[in-house]
């Protein structure tokens, strides 16, 4: 992510609710802004998460995209520590539900996405990178070459990594569990 965007995201992490409201009103065109009724059910903490999410996507998409209601509902739920299930069809924007928390989290945080298909991993990696998030897919096609891991010392590699995609069966091998709770 370029330093200007990173600086902007860092600033919004520290904005007060009043500053978030003002910035949202001044930045997001009224025709793209979510209806007032959507925001009314949220208390201050969750409202701040939602506004911050809108501003993060607006900035990283080149001022083109504002998350829709289901994406914000999912983000607010995730960022509030709740278990979250998003059940919408192909092409509706589930990937953005994974991208937004990465943008809102502190720099250096790591997200792990378990993805069942290598092609889906490839598409999602490209989408994450489009928003400036350093991403890598690790699956059975990743070389099992010790030299690869010497190039990226494990600790540094994971600190630089924002999102890691891996196949469900690799998750089971590494963690010895099905991944479900």
Feature locations, PLM:
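N-terminal helicase ATP-binding lobe
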Residues: 1-181
């Amino acid at each position: 992510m370029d330093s200007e965007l990173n600086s902007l995201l860092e600033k919004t992490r520290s904005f007060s609710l009043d500053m978030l409201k003002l910035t949202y009103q001044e930045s997001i065109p009224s025709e793209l802004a979510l209806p007032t009724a959507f925001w009314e059910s949220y208390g201050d903490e969750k409202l701040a998460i939602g506004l911050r999410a809108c501003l993060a996507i607006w900035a990283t998409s080149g001022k083109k995209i504002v998350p829709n209601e289901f994406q914000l509902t999912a983000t607010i739920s995730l960022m509030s520590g709740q278990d979250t299930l998003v059940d919408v069809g192909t092409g509706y924007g589930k990937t953005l539900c994974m991208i937004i928390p990465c943008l809102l989290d502190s720099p250096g945080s790591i997200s792990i996405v378990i993805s069942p298909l290598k092609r889906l991993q490839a598409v999602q990696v490209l989408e994450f990178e489009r928003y400036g998030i350093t991403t890598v897919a690790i699956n059975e096609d990743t070389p099992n070459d010790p030299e690869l891991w010497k190039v990226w010392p494990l600790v540094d590699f994971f600190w630089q990594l924002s999102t890691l995609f891996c196949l469900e069966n690799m998750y089971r091998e590494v963690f010895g569990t099905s991944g479900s709770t």
